[in-house]
């Protein structure tokens, strides 16, 4: 099987019966209406797909796949599923009818989505006559002014006679040549699903637009938002089986491991490296989004209303929570949208908002944060959050976007979450290296200015501690927490201070750098005191608690001596290393000389100690390979 050739994907738009399907049939030689009912009624009901090659130059062509959308207002949800994922549009207006109701609403929708107008075709030119056609061409150009389609050339065509079709093909080829490239094909894999069905012998088939990334036969995939895993059994693009396909492409995917009833329009196919099983990490599913919203001139947008969100091929009802009051007609604002159904929404996705009661498009916008913090309460907090969202909306580059995303969460955000938002760990870490305001620590990305008071609190607590003693780590964590530091971040901040030599670590406890000479001197006094107590009668050591209390030595400093091998713990007793070595030598020169065996009582008498000390000593010598024991007698092992 081959690798699918690159293609451009274009959606149609325009009023019902203005000749969209007929124009595509003339351009491609293919029938876009799939259903018998559509052909019988001459009315597009659902999405149709056709394709063709357009000549750019004598030896260069561009493959174009067309998504034919319905123009009837009763099927607007289907229309939105088509244009919701396609960046480029062929806008159609009939010369005889001229600009009509759905022409206007389709233009509003396309402008809200920021779609690029490739070409506008004024159809039925011969039926309307040259004068009427010229009027409509001029009118379409005027109506496009100030919208995302304003640079679209407007051409007169007639699908029946073929008038203007060659010019339209040339304009399409010229406008589409090289429009998409490596940036889209190298991005995170994402396929918006618009159909799911079953084929006998093959199983589940889904179709949709691969908007970015790659898919290959054998790939493991996840269907979002429910997170069901599947495997790519086969791929088809433009009617041919292929081994792999890259965005942007229309593609049919044969999925193994899923029934077709488990997949529906509005689901998204993701690769596992871009989909987290955590509900807090965007890409797989989200139930709330912060958005920038533009209200159309005829409609205010507020809390009250039956709002329907359309994004990608998906739709759901939403609760509307404007941040700073209702958004007036023709103005912009920010809002929190709470989704009735989780959707696989990402940063930067564009959407359309419709009033279900009035069956009217009222606005649209862009997703600024698909994993927002808890909705801010109080006017001051809402204003602060709105300013941060302004910063996000205005961000023109990746570093500014990252800073704004961190600010949107109060100056601290999960590294995993940011990586998912931005397309991967490598993308995030490369950008963070150039952002002076932020640092990554303990799985979080944090504003440096926020960290400063936390580190100051840690250092201050270390300074205030007695110079002769090290501070427990928990005490420094508590000091940082009192200044608002999350407890999960404080240990990493302490480790950073140790690495910067502002703190020194001894046995897991901390000492301020200025206290270190005093501490080391006091520690040596304590160590010497303990060793003296143990060596006063080396093989008859004192009670450990009594000895450590007398030396005023904390347990972690005792552990340091144990770790260094200066002191040895034999069950509940402490011996110096030299005492252990001396005990072994006495056995070797005494009852165990020349390979003789001996009893525990003989060892005890040789050492002139008690059974309390002798038995732990003998067990230590056995476990360290100095002696052996057969159940009754001990024997010194030759070194």
Give a label for each model feature.
Residues 1-69:
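Conserved G1/Walker A P-loop phosphate-binding module
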Residues 2, 125, 142-297:
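Conserved catalytic-core segments of large NTP-driven translation/proteostasis enzymes
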Residues 62, 69-74, 83-135:
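Conserved Switch II/interswitch segment of TRAFAC-class P-loop GTPases
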Residues 229, 371-639:
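C-terminal non-catalytic scaffold/interaction domains in large multidomain proteins
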Residues 220-394, 491:
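Beta-strand/loop-dominated core regions that host nucleotide or nucleotide-derived cofactor-binding catalytic loops
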Residues 10-14, 18-26, 74-79, 98-101, ...:
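P-loop/Walker A NTP-binding module and the surrounding RecA-like catalytic core of P-loop NTPases
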Residues 94-96, 118-135, 155-163, 168, ...:
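G-domain G4 guanine-recognition motif of GTPases
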Residues 72-73, 96-100, 115, 124-129, ...:
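Conserved nucleotide-binding/hydrolysis micro-motifs of P-loop NTPases
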